[in-house]
């Protein structure tokens, strides 16, 4: 391999080309009339999706420079996906527009730093203007409307998500999984709990695409102690390994030799295992482990006071669950198989009694948090269909709608269909740059905030975007939007065309920040195959699809 440094016009041209390719592929999915994208797989049938992030991740250019640029953009999109689970398409459209405008300005000889200062100044004004337009989401109908919009107008998905929120509360745990039946969508409420602790090592991951640990019917081992040596829990590991089922370890910590041994065992294809830290601290950790034990039906939480030794613990003494899902930040236990409603009800009554007698506001608050986790349960949205392709496409839409709903409940909603960003134009009129190039940066953002609504209207098959923008900007009602479903103007909140503020805000913020990175990017160092590498790879010629290996 040899290193090549790419600079100047060659670099700018590559950036423009990669951004255009990504925006063309991702942008076509925007809006209720957006199109789907087929992603080919090495094995099996192609995946059909409208998930912008999934489309972006699947694009892998051949040229090393294009790969480097695409990776920078995809990493930014992944931040948007991690923070709100939605908004990747909007982020892509905005990024493409800003970079396109900046490239023109640079070609005309404008000062990059001044442009950047103008863009960042305009960014703050746009974010402030978005906050002034927000409305809180209160009713079940509004929740259903937000979910419906994010699910590309599928009212069934919107209604089911609203049902889940009603059953487990706005802060409750809602998960999505594939159904084995043919029903489009069904809701199942079950016992369960989620807490804010993720896997202790990414090597535990079983779903590499989503960076998740997913276990079906696992055993759960609970301990208040630190696990430094695998020898201390070896009897439990051996018993579970013989059963052929996965194991989740919840402990104060798992570190050193114990963690490395568990990881090595997993990588070698042995026991399916994952370890997470127990939630809380001190006495609160002890109480929360007790709550998890009740949910999972575990007989013991191992500690120094327990008379039973680890080697005496049988499989019947461990907790169980139907499903466990672990991300880098959270652990969700769904549907304990063995726990019964009586033990959970008894635990809930005990916590309620503690709340009544507690004189500390802080203690009461923490007890109420525990009560909510125990009593809320988990709502499971089961997605079905007549084919694997259909199920996966629908599941993507359900997950996007669920993320959008959570964001809407958290920060409120703004007018949808790209109207909220369009209405921030008024806030930019009063901002003046220190010089012509800084003003150019402000004007670039003015053009960028019009890009999402233009793309949504274009995807509907209409060429009326300029007329729509002109009409919306001439009137004073910031709740008026253009509904591409009906091709008419309507009130955003009455018609249900709303976007979560958090999604719009983060998508815009990340898009501008990403564009700012490319603005000051002067060189990219890439590895390119040397002649010797090419000759060596060619020795295996004739092996179609092997990529030279």
From Swiss-Prot:
ATP binds at residues 29-32, 50, 86-90, 417, 499. The keyword Transcription does not apply. It catalyses: ATP + H2O + a folded polypeptide = ADP + phosphate + an unfolded polypeptide. GO terms for cellular component: cytoplasm. This is Chaperonin GroEL. Forms a cylinder of 14 subunits composed of two heptameric rings stacked back-to-back. Interacts with the co-chaperonin GroES. Keywords: ATP-binding, Chaperone, Cytoplasm, Isomerase, Nucleotide-binding. It comes from the Bacteria. The keyword Cell division does not apply. It is found in: Cytoplasm. Coiled coil: none annotated. Together with its co-chaperonin GroES, plays an essential role in assisting protein folding. The GroEL-GroES system forms a nano-cage that allows encapsulation of the non-native substrate proteins and provides a physical environment optimized to promote and accelerate protein folding. Its main location: cytoplasm. SUPFAM superfamilies: GroEL apical domain-like (SSF52029), GroEL equatorial domain-like (SSF48592), GroEL-intermediate domain like (SSF54849). The lineage of its organism: Bacteria, Pseudomonadati, Pseudomonadota, Alphaproteobacteria, Rickettsiales. Its EC number is 5.6.1.7. One of its GO terms (molecular function) is unfolded protein binding. CDD domains: GroEL (cd03344). One of its GO terms (biological process) is protein refolding. It holds the Pfam family Cpn60_TCP1. PANTHER family: 60 KDA HEAT SHOCK PROTEIN, MITOCHONDRIAL. Belongs to the chaperonin (HSP60) family.
């Amino acid at each position: 391999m040899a290193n090549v440094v790419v600079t100047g016009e060659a670099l700018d041209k590559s950036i423009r080309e990669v951004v255009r390719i990504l925006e063309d592929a991702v942008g076509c999915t925007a809006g209720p009339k957006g199109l789907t994208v087929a992603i080919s797989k090495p094995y099996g049938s192609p995946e059909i999706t409208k998930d912008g992030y999934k489309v972006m991740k699947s694009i892998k250019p051949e040229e090393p420079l294009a790969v480097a640029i695409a990776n920078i953009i995809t990493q930014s999109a992944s931040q948007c996906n991690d923070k709100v689970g939605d908004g990747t398409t909007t982020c892509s459209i905005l990024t493409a527009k800003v970079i396109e405008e900046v490239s023109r300005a640079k070609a005309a000889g404008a000062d990059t730093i001044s442009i950047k200062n103008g863009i960042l100044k305009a960014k703050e004004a746009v974010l402030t203007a978005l906050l002034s337009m927000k409305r809180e989401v209160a009713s079940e109908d509004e929740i259903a409307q937000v979910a419906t919009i994010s699910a590309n107008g599928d009212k069934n998905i919107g209604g089911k998500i609203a049902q889940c929120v009603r059953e487990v509360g706005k802060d409750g745990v809602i998960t999505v999984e594939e159904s084995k039946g043919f029903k489009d969508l069904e809701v199942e409420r079950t016992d369960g709990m989620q807490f804010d602790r993720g896997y202790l090592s990414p090597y535990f991951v079983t779903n590499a695409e989503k960076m998740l640990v997913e276990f079906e019917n696992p055993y759960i081992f609970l301990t208040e102690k630190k696990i430094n040596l695998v020898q201390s829990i070896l009897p439990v590991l051996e018993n579970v390994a013989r059963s052929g089922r996965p194991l989740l370890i919840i402990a104060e910590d798992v570190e050193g030799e114990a963690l490395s041994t568990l990881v090595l065992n997993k990588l070698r294809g042995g026991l399916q295992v994952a370890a997470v830290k127990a939630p809380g601290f001190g006495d609160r950790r002890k109480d929360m482990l007790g709550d998890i034990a009740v949910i999972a039906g575990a007989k013991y939480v191992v500690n120094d006071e327990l008379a039973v030794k680890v080697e005496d613990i049988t499989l019947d003494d461990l907790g169980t669950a139907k499903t466990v899902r672990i991300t880098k930040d959270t652990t969700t236990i769904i549907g304990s198989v063995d726990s019964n409603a009586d033990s959970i009800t008894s635990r809930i009554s005990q916590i309620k009694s503690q709340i009544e007698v507690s004189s500390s506001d802080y203690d009461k608050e923490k007890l109420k948090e525990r009560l909510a986790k125990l009593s809320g349960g988990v709502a499971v949205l089961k997605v079905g269909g007549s084919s694997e392709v259909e199920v996966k496409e629908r599941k993507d839409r359900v997950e996007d709608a669920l993320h959008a709903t959570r964001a809407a409940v958290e920060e409120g909603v703004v007018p949808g269909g790209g109207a909220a960003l369009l209405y921030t134009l008024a806030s930019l009129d009063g901002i003046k740059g220190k010089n012509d190039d800084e003003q150019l940066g402000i004007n670039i953002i003015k053009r960028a905030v019009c890009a999402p609504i233009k793309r949504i209207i274009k995807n509907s098959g209409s060429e009326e975007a300029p007329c729509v923008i002109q009409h919306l900007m001439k009137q004073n009602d910031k709740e008026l939007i253009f509904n591409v479903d009906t091709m008419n103007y309507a009130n955003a909140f009455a018609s249900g065309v709303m976007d979560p503020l958090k999604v719009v805000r983060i998508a815009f913020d990340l898009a501008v920040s990403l564009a700012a990175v490319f603005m000051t990017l002067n060189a990219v160092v890439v590895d390119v195959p040397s002649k010797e590498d090419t000759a060596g790879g060619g020795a295996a010629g004739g092996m179609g699809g092997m990529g030279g290996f």
